[in-house]
């Protein structure tokens, strides 16, 4: 069992055969060691009881019913009497039946078997460590060919071949003869090596530190050579350098985690606890079994057949032995990852068997569906919509979701304020949706953050905390600036909301997970809260204005009154006299009174100390008044000057959208400057 206080993380990796044996074996009170599964049977067809030493054996995995052995005897669990704690007839311990959820078994393989994840998955770890092509290793694993291994200094059959100056044409047919004769085991153990055993020997002979040193030397040599001028050769060099880097990283990982490379070849195959691969009886007396049970049975059948060939019959042809070893390897491959070598194995109904990899990987796998994606209390889910009026650290929760999430807190508040005598009365008030309920709910939400999560959670910004506020409707309102961290948009995306309960969780949510504290990407440090999608379109509409220039609009800056008068030219062009405003407040007030539009051009009086004049720009028109004053009209501004060429005032041509955007930027800069001054 995993203690959640002692174990804070879960890691999947390689383990030694000794560790597998320690997990799966146990010593029963009579001193007998059990744990090895030797029979491919599950339940007896007459008694419906688990077969001894089978895949559901009660001696190995524990009793089906707590305190009841296979014989039917009953003992009280935890009784301190001198009664034996196991049945002497069947050897089953009197323990809790929950042990069948975590007690493992093992299959002792007659021949070594490579772990298909480390051989066939890309990149192939075995091929990287051995620095050999994957196809060559596959041919060796599946007994398609062998390689010589003269392990002694004495003359051997294969060494004699090199002592001749010429080679007889029929020499290549002489070695296969040994595969069909008696004494093949002696020849094989002395002369050749094939199958997963050959891979295991090569991995066991590796020195990881020497691999790192040699790979680093070769990488430096390739880097010093420089480009050859041949594009094909340069690509080969780049690929080789990338391979050397991966090989060094893999070797360093093995050293850092104290993993031996030969552990990628299995000698003991773990058997999952029975409760994780159940057989269930449904209506009509039919049985439904997990596919993993059938795959385990296939492995045991083939492994027992190989054992019989090597032990009971001494005259078994070597080709038959190698063929059976290949079948064992393929059976284990199918158990671990069905279909990784091509066509998947199917049952009698042409249905693909669900292997161990299929059980744990993907959206419906054990981790994502049962562990990471399981339903939890104090959580809800809804569609997200944009909340432009929200602060960056706030989110809008629908009343229907909020009252369910904070119901226990509201009940406590009602009882503390003596508005309800007990929990039942408080729940009835919540169902009736009395006004006092919403008041207490708002008080509770003010001091309690919530966590928003959007699947898939690929980095830590996939879960952020917000200060909730009540909103109408049934959707969660979210500030558009936080969407990039969630990789969310408002086209129907859903997000989950969670309530942190413990003080530690609330402190972490406030100090580390608030959205306004996660403005930079944790990976590269770039700003993560930047305008995207809807905000960019809104800013474009806000600041676009009309495309008509000053030449298309014959302005008369002297006529600053009655700017709503309109006249239509012969070209059906609607011309509006553009108004003048002394400050931005008057312009925004006119927009709110619907006297002008958001993109209507206007003239805004500007401060004289802010330069808007380009050095080489010349006026488009100059209008003179009777008193000698004149107006220089440019493309986007005009200047009022006196007879002495003194500047009276400056007007810039802009829109209400530009003014609003400028004021927001100005307030943000002023607030940032004040914050910096307080810090200093």
From Swiss-Prot:
Zn(2+) binds at residues 69, 71, 87, 90. GO terms for cellular component: chloroplast; DNA-directed RNA polymerase complex; mitochondrion. Keywords: Chloroplast, DNA-directed RNA polymerase, Magnesium, Metal-binding, Nucleotidyltransferase, Plastid, Transcription, Transferase, Zinc. InterPro entries: DNA-dir_RpoC_beta_prime, RNA_pol_asu, RNA_pol_N, RNA_pol_Rpb1_1, RNA_pol_Rpb1_3_sf, RNA_pol_Rpb1_clamp_domain, RNApol_RpoC1. Gene3D superfamilies: 1.10.40.90, 2.40.40.20, RNA polymerase II, clamp domain (4.10.860.120), RNA polymerase Rpb1, domain 3 (1.10.274.100). Its cofactor is Mg(2+); Zn(2+). One of its GO terms (biological process) is DNA-templated transcription. It is an enzyme of class 2 (transferase). It catalyses: RNA(n) + a ribonucleoside 5'-triphosphate = RNA(n+1) + diphosphate. The keyword Metal-binding applies. Mg(2+) binds at residues 489, 491, 493. GO terms for molecular function: DNA binding; DNA-directed RNA polymerase activity; magnesium ion binding; zinc ion binding. Binds 1 Mg(2+) ion per subunit. Its EC number is 2.7.7.6. It is found in: Plastid, Chloroplast. Belongs to the RNA polymerase beta' chain family. RpoC1 subfamily. In plastids the minimal PEP RNA polymerase catalytic core is composed of four subunits: alpha, beta, beta', and beta''. When a (nuclear-encoded) sigma factor is associated with the core the holoenzyme is formed, which can initiate transcription. DNA-dependent RNA polymerase catalyzes the transcription of DNA into RNA using the four ribonucleoside triphosphates as substrates. This is DNA-directed RNA polymerase subunit beta'. It comes from Barbarea verna (Land cress). The lineage of its organism: Eukaryota, Viridiplantae, Streptophyta, Embryophyta, Tracheophyta.
């Amino acid at each position: 069992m995993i203690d959640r206080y002692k174990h804070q993380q879960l890691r999947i990796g390689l383990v030694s055969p000794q560790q597998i044996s320690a997990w799966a074996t146990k010593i029963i009170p009579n001193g007998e060691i059990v744990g090895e599964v030797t029979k491919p049977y599950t339940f007896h067809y007459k008694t419906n009881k688990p077969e001894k030493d089978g895949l559901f054996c009660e001696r190995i995995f524990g009793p089906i019913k707590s305190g009841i052995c296979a014989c039917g005897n009953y003992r009280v669990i935890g009784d301190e009497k001198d009664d034996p704690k196991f049945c002497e007839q069947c050897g089953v311990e009197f323990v809790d039946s929950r042990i069948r959820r975590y007690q493992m078994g093992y299959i002792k393989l007659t021949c070594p078997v490579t772990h298909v994840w480390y051989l066939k998955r890309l990149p192939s770890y075995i091929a990287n460590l051995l620095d050999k092509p994957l196809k060559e290793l596959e041919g060796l694993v599946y007994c398609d060919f062998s390689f010589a291994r003269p392990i002694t200094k004495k003359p051997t059959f294969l060494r004699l071949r090199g002592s001749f100056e010429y080679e007889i044409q029929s020499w290549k047919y002489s070695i296969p003869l040994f595969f069909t004769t008696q004494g093949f085991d002696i020849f094989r153990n002395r002369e050749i090596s094939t199958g997963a055993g050959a891979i295991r020997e090569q991995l066991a002979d590796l020195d990881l530190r020497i691999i790192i040193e040699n790979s680093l030397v070769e990488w430096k040599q390739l880097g010093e050579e420089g480009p050859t001028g041949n594009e094909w050769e340069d690509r080969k060099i780049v690929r080789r350098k990338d391979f050397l880097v991966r090989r060094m990283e893999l070797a360093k990982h093995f050293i850092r985690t104290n993993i031996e490379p030969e552990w990628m070849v299995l000698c003991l195959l773990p058997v999952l606890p029975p409760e994780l691969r159940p057989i269930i009886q449904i209506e009509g007396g039919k049985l439904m079994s997990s596919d993993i049970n059938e795959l385990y049975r296939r492995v045991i059948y083939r492994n027992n057949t190989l054992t019989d060939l090597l032990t009971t019959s001494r005259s078994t042809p070597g080709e038959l032995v190698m063929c059976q070893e290949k079948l064992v390897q393929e059976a284990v491959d199918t158990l671990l990852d069905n279909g990784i070598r091509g066509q998947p194995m199917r049952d009698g109904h042409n249905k693909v068997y669900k292997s161990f990899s299929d059980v744990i990987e993907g959206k419906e796998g054990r981790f994502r569906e049962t562990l990471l994606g399981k339903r939890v209390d104090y959580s809800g889910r809804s569609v997200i919509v944009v909340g432009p009026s929200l602060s960056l650290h706030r989110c809008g929760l629908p009343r229907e979701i909020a009252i369910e999430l904070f119901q226990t807190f509201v009940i406590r508040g009602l009882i503390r304020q003596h508005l309800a005598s007990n929990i039942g009365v408080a729940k009835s008030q919540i169902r009736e949706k009395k006004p006092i309920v919403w008041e207490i709910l708002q008080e509770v939400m003010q001091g309690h953050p919530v966590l928003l999560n959007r699947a898939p959670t690929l980095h830590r910004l996939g879960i952020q905390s917000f200060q909730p506020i009540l909103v109408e409707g049934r959707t969660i309102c979210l500030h558009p600036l936080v969407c990039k961290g969630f990789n969310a948009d408002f086209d129907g995306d859903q997000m989950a909301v969670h309530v942190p309960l413990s003080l530690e969780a609330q402190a972490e949510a406030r100090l580390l997970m608030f959205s306004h504290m996660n403005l930079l990407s944790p990976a590269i440090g770039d700003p993560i809260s930047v305008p995207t999608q809807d905000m960019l379109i809104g800013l474009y509409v806000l600041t676009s204005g009309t495309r008509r220039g000053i030449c298309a609009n014959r302005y008369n800056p002297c006529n600053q009154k009655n700017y709503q008068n309109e006249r239509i030219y012969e070209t059906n062009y609607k011309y509006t006299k553009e108004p003048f405003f002394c400050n931005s407040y008057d312009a925004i007030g006119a927009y709110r009174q619907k006297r002008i539009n958001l993109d209507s051009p206007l003239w805004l009086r500007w401060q004289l100390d802010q330069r808007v004049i380009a050095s080489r720009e010349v006026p488009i028109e100059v209008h003179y008044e009777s008193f000698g004053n004149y107006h220089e009209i440019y493309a986007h501004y005009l200047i009022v000057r006196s007879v002495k060429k003194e500047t009276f005032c400056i007007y810039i041509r802009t829109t209400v959208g530009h003014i609003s955007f400028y004021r927001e930027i100005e307030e943000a800069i002023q607030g940032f400057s004040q914050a910096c001054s307080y810090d200093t």
